[in-house]
């Protein structure tokens, strides 16, 4: 496989900005991983697909995105190929950065999920839907989510819950943005 441009460089990042705030601006398609480097005021977002990365890169360059009133600089990271284990898990198990938890007890809170699961790797977002006893935990990488999905069901304290992959929140492209993307790529 030939390495392709699927990693986008985000410069001029505010040092206090969180991954969640950055990813709230990125609704183009599934992401493999996100690396924040606050000491260098930048981040790298690796999409699963080069076309999605190109759409984000082009649209962000045109519409000029900003975070905490700072205009972000958009560029390219090093071309790369997704690791084969991740490609396989995405194709055969619908792996994503998002892990779904079902049949949760009433004592499970957003804080307990965050503290229990952060040992696997950095977390983007935790969304607990109490009425349905479910939660979605978005990690910064598919690799971390894969570790959670394969490890936790074996653990006695987690085996009573349903654990699987959910849809990456960045894969949801709002209708208005779909039209903009279609227009920009004609």
Residue ranges of model-derived segments:
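Low-complexity RS/RG/RGG-rich segments used by eukaryotic RNA-binding proteins and nuclear co-regulators
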Residues: 63-92, 155-183
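Conserved RNP beta-strands of RNA recognition motif
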Residues: 10-13, 26, 42-57, 74, ...
């Amino acid at each position: 496989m030939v390495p392709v441009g699927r990693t986008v460089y985000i410069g001029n990042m505010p040092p206090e900005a969180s991954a969640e705030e950055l990813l709230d601006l990125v609704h183009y398609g599934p992401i493999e991983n996100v690396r924040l480097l606050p000491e260098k005021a930048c981040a790298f977002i690796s999409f699963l697909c080069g076309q999605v990365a190109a759409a984000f890169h082009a649209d962000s360059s045109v519409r000029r995105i900003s975070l905490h009133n700072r205009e972000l600089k958009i560029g390219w990271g090093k071309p790369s190929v997704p690791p084969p284990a991740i490609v396989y898990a995405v194709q055969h198990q619908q792996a994503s950065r998002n892990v779904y938890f079902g049949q949760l007890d009433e004592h499970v809170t957003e804080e307990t999920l965050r503290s229990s699961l952060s040992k696997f790797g950095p977390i983007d977002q935790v969304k607990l839907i109490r009425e349905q006893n479910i939660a979605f935990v978005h990690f910064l990488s598919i690799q971390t989510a894969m570790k959670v999905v394969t490890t936790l069901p074996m653990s006695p304290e987690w085996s009573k819950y349903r654990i699987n992959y959910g849809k990456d929140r960045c894969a949801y492209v709002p209708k208005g943005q779909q039209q903009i993307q279609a227009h920009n790529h004609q």
